[in-house]
Amino acid sequence: MAKEEPQSISRDLQELQKKLSLLIDSFQNNSKVVAFMKSPVGQYLDSHPFLAFTLLVFIVMSAVPVGFFLLIVVLTTLAALLGVIILEGLVISVGGFSLLCILCGLGFVSLAMSGMMIASYVVVSSLISCWFSPRPLTQQNTSCDFLPAMKSAEFEGLYQE
């Protein structure tokens, strides 16, 4: 039963990899994505993946504050139609300044988060490739051993007096 579990995990990972590759292929073959990737902005972001990932994280994280800001703008515009023009200017100014502060903070947070996510992706992918590699057991121990192995002669020489 213990031998069947790693094979099951490996098979599940292969199925997941096939599904993800099909999803990525369907996304990359979309006509709008192809048109964007041929544009200068798409080519620049393709050559700078960290910047593209940071931009994606920033856009996702800034959706809620921008939505709240637009809601406040619409509500104050409706209030202005009722005669509260000075209040609208004040609220939009304060809201715009608040949005600027929030978006600057989200920019720094998204930069830090994308850096941590990419670093954790590199670490996890290297650990997974080390743990689940299809190499024989003898090769796997030598290539993924994080502690250096000491020869027995060196070990005995350390403790002789």
Curated annotation (Swiss-Prot):
Keywords in alphabetical order: Endoplasmic reticulum, Lipid droplet, Membrane, Transmembrane, Transmembrane helix
Coiled-coil region list: none
Intrachain S-S bonds: none
InterPro entries registered for this protein in UniProt: LDAF1 (IPR029709)
Protein's cellular compartments: Endoplasmic reticulum membrane; Lipid droplet
Cytoplasmic compartment residues: 1-43, 88-93, 134-161
GO CC, alphabetical: endoplasmic reticulum membrane; lipid droplet
Bilayer topology annotation: Multi-pass membrane protein
Entry function: Plays an important role in the formation of lipid droplets (LD) which are storage organelles at the center of lipid and energy homeostasis. In association with BSCL2/seipin, defines the sites of LD formation in the endoplasmic reticulum.
Subunit (UniProt): Interacts with isoform 1 and isoform 3 of BSCL2/seipin to form an oligomeric complex.
Similarity remark: Belongs to the LDAF1 family.
UniProt protein name: Lipid droplet assembly factor 1
Organism (species): Homo sapiens
